[in-house]
Amino acid sequence: MSWIKDQVILLTGGGSGLGLALIERFIAEGAKVGVLELSAEKATALAHCFGNDICVIHGDVVSFEDNERAVAETVRCFGKLDCFVGNAGIWDHKISLLDASPEQIDKGFDELMGVNLKGYILGAKAALPALTASEGSMIFTLSNSSWFSGGGGVLYTASKHGAVGMIRQLAYELAPVIRVNGVAPCGMPSDLRGAASLSQQDRCITDNLSLESLSAILPLQFIPQPKDFTGPYVMLASRANNRTLTGVMITADAGLSIRGIRQTTAGVMSPTKKESSDDR
């Protein structure tokens, strides 16, 4: 029996990776899905693939008007909104404070914070009236970088730490009507791109992240696929199975949090690291 049958869920960033896996899972569970997608090509592919089960809106999460339009179109297509999932994000390919120029920090900060944090807040604001009417929920995608250093650079890590505070504050503000939670996956093979302001827009996370090295540090010793992370979202969206959770962040990281990201205590400025860098 489905936990979210007949629900209507609006998701941001659904063209690939975790977002696409969530769409597939939600529809398989009997839900209807609205998607706000930046890529026109991916938006067209989604509409073609999922037909009447999906409402695709081409737009940008950093625009309140696009978020508002996504909510309106989803409600127009399916009559209501039960859950908003903030999922669109970009990475920084671990660019450090040491390596980033002042200009990169300035522009990269605006872009990373804009997509990864401002986009979540604007989506929440746009979805608020419809979710108030349905007494629904919000779910936001976090990261192991929401808790630990080393999973991204200073800009990405700051944006994901910021999302934790946002979830807690929204859970406080929107209770008792709307539940607000998060899911923090570890790394996975996906098309997660870097920031254009850092000239990383054509690089995806797997260009920088070795999946074999990821598997080696995960206590569960396997490479998680995007579909492996979808279960917590279904549970959090379910009214029957989640009456008590708000302000909760589920760490779905194959055990990474019980051992941390790095074994070494040396930072990027350590002599060992510098020698290794010089050798290259």
Swiss-Prot record:
The active site is at 156 (proton acceptor). Substrate binds at residue 143. Pfam families: adh_short (PF00106). Pathway: Aromatic compound metabolism; 3-phenylpropanoate degradation. CDD domains: BphB-like_SDR_c. InterPro entries: BphB-like_SDR, Dihydrodiol_DH_HcaB, NAD(P)-bd_dom_sf, Sc_DH/Rdtase_CS, SDR_fam. Keywords: Aromatic hydrocarbons catabolism, NAD, Oxidoreductase. The keyword Oxidoreductase applies. One of its GO terms (molecular function) is 2,3-dihydroxy-2,3-dihydro-phenylpropionate dehydrogenase activity. It comes from the Bacteria. GO terms for biological process: 3-phenylpropionate catabolic process. Its EC number is 1.3.1.87. Converts 3-phenylpropionate-dihydrodiol (PP-dihydrodiol) and cinnamic acid-dihydrodiol (CI-dihydrodiol) into 3-(2,3-dihydroxylphenyl)propanoic acid (DHPP) and 2,3-dihydroxicinnamic acid (DHCI), respectively. Belongs to the short-chain dehydrogenases/reductases (SDR) family. This is 3-phenylpropionate-dihydrodiol/cinnamic acid-dihydrodiol dehydrogenase. It comes from Photorhabdus laumondii subsp. laumondii (strain DSM 15139 / CIP 105565 / TT01). The lineage of its organism: Bacteria, Pseudomonadati, Pseudomonadota, Gammaproteobacteria, Enterobacterales.
